């Protein structure tokens, strides 16, 4: 053994080849400070052994290296610039040391080689991957850029255009794509990985492969003609900005860094990378996106823990077909859990199966599936007009019409047809789980399972705990949602649960602006372009359906009359009474048609303005800051109330619910990250300015106390 630490082992193989194996004590290899130090020491030991003729890097885990240890980032990024720069420079000495060894080197890549893992393999002369490999530099998704030489080495290995596409998108690349651009040199079956890597390394040692020229290319400036470089970077800037937009600076920084470093050698190019990394690491965007990543890990960790308590789900059933039922059936079947789709009407079953078939066909068209897999998934969906096939289900998802009496009747009915220990859930967006539980003989096996529409796209599932729901029931539904590929958050029962409860105060703020004469299109523009929502409130209401919104608003008003009760008609009432339900009947705040490519098209409609003007009078202009304040303050305060009341367990879960369930702008991190960034005291002062608008604008006593103590929600958690 040449070297051994808790994360790295180096042994000498025959023919004087050193084998460095990453083998951390946890479930995955990642580049934390300890691993970087170990790699440095291992390379020193290798360099001191004069008999070594080549080096092979491998991993003892199912993944090569998943990246840097992101849990270290927030603390590290809070350090002084000099400390952060010193960390970057010291880490890069290690990667340079790997690249500068006096003999050929190769990486044998299995599973994920992401971020620092990808930067490690780029520092070796050759790269062989097996068919399980996924390679990429996802740092821009965290609001930063690669910091261990990724922007320097990748363009010199795969070319500028390919490197720009890889790094700015942050996407994992399949091994076939990596082979096509030259990021890897060979692609083999998993069982052939080490033997193929050793053969290539021996060929390099025997001078059959020119490793010196390859290495020299990575150390030198990019060989790019000046005119071609100008055109390439100008095109890239336009394309990247179009996708990333102004709120996400990291992808544009990548283009700038590679452009600035193009004429520099490795040392100069690394300095350019370090300065850009330093600048981005200090941004609020990076703090927010890293926070989302860590929150996601926390939520997934809770789901994994729930799996230990959970009842095994081998089969499922959904009651109510149609678009929603079909979406749930597709999601369950495509992730490996067979499901019965039960309805009382054959046309509804046909619609549900049609929805599942359409989603699967789209996967085949994109190359993400094939006809054989599509057939297998469809075979996992059993349509039924009676309860006979439902009897074997371990979990039942009731997804019938959003009406308490209908749901209660169906729930009572299905309880008679399933096993004693089957779990029953309701996919309701507004109806109290405690109320629905009254229709069941065994309410302990019942909870809510709120999917968001469209099911296949929206990552969130709210698992709603009723007062009688058992821990096993909740854990089993969390585990089933995770198995379906969803992110579950557990919330306690209340009107609107969590997501809808905080959404409707936002809509109330929007309605208040319209009642004061604001232009809904102007509000949408501010909330989309400036605040960063994917849709403004008017457009979102049209997509949700103003009939659905009208019903949910009534539920919220009944549940929280002191804050959400209405004294008169609002804009949602106006649209509902005019039977302008949104996209579903092609007219809401906007009017909808189909363009030449068959895609929905949104246009302003004079009728909407006439209806609103008739109710609220002449239009008037509002400043952007007031629009943002009047829509966001109610949502933020209601989110805080949910935390204080125990509806949601933590700021992290609340923020994930908002980002995954509503599309809250990720670069702002969620309500609690946004509050902490803004400063709770600053928010309280802003809310007080609008407190005269009613209860939705009045902060809680606990918020005032936190503000007075200069506290923050994540620090408190």
Swiss-Prot record:
Residues 311-717 are annotated as: 3-hydroxyacyl-CoA dehydrogenase. Its EC number is 4.2.1.17, 5.1.2.3, 5.3.3.8, 1.1.1.35. GO terms for cellular component: fatty acid beta-oxidation multienzyme complex. It holds the Pfam family 3HCDH. It comes from the Bacteria. GO terms for biological process: fatty acid beta-oxidation. Keywords: Fatty acid metabolism, Isomerase, Lipid degradation, Lipid metabolism, Lyase, Multifunctional enzyme, NAD, Oxidoreductase. One of its GO terms (molecular function) is enoyl-CoA hydratase activity. Pathway: Lipid metabolism; fatty acid beta-oxidation. NAD(+) binds at residues 324, 343, 400-402, 407, 429, 453. Gene3D superfamilies: 1.10.1040.50, 2-enoyl-CoA Hydratase, Chain A, domain 1 (3.90.226.10), NAD(P)-binding Rossmann-like Domain (3.40.50.720). The keyword Kinase does not apply. InterPro entries: 3-OHacyl-CoA_DH_CS, 3-OHacyl-CoA_DH_NAD-bd, 3HC_DH_C, 6-PGluconate_DH-like_C_sf, ClpP/crotonase-like_dom_sf, Enoyl-CoA_hyd/isom_CS, Enoyl-CoA_hydra/iso, FA_oxidation_alpha_subunit. It catalyses: a (3S)-3-hydroxyacyl-CoA + NAD(+) = a 3-oxoacyl-CoA + NADH + H(+); a (3S)-3-hydroxyacyl-CoA = a (2E)-enoyl-CoA + H2O; a 4-saturated-(3S)-3-hydroxyacyl-CoA = a (3E)-enoyl-CoA + H2O; (3S)-3-hydroxybutanoyl-CoA = (3R)-3-hydroxybutanoyl-CoA. The active site is at residue 450. Substrate binds at residues 296, 500, 660. The keyword Lyase applies. The record marks 119, 139 as: Important for catalytic activity. In the N-terminal section; belongs to the enoyl-CoA hydratase/isomerase family. In the C-terminal section; belongs to the 3-hydroxyacyl-CoA dehydrogenase family. Heterotetramer of two alpha chains (FadB) and two beta chains (FadA). Involved in the aerobic and anaerobic degradation of long-chain fatty acids via beta-oxidation cycle. Catalyzes the formation of 3-oxoacyl-CoA from enoyl-CoA via L-3-hydroxyacyl-CoA. It can also use D-3-hydroxyacyl-CoA and cis-3-enoyl-CoA as substrate. NCBIfam families: FadB, PRK11730.1. This is Fatty acid oxidation complex subunit alpha. It comes from Shewanella piezotolerans (strain WP3 / JCM 13877). The gene is fadB.
